[in-house]
Amino acid sequence: MRVADWIWKTLADWGTEHVFLVTGGGAMHLNDALGRETRIRYVCNLHEQACAMAAEGYARISGKPGVVSVTTGPGGTNALTGVVGAWLDSVPMIVISGQIK
């Protein structure tokens, strides 16, 4: 089992049902593993900031942590505005970023 497979399996075991993501080369193993985890639905966005804000809204409404998956470099930093907003309001969020190495 790859680490990427373990991440999504574990989150699914913990009750995660939705992930907000932007695909990218640095996160391809994560994207591939997520596509094979049948218990989690993914919502593709066009920008990482939108993923983080959607996850924050999801967490506020559902009471479950919002989960974000982004690619490396700018993908991770683009999500920061939404992450800081969630942190300031104590909204639970899990952010996973790919890594090239």
Predicted features and spans:
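N-terminal alpha/beta PP-like core and its mobile active-site loop of ThDP/TPP-dependent enzymes
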Residues: M1-K101
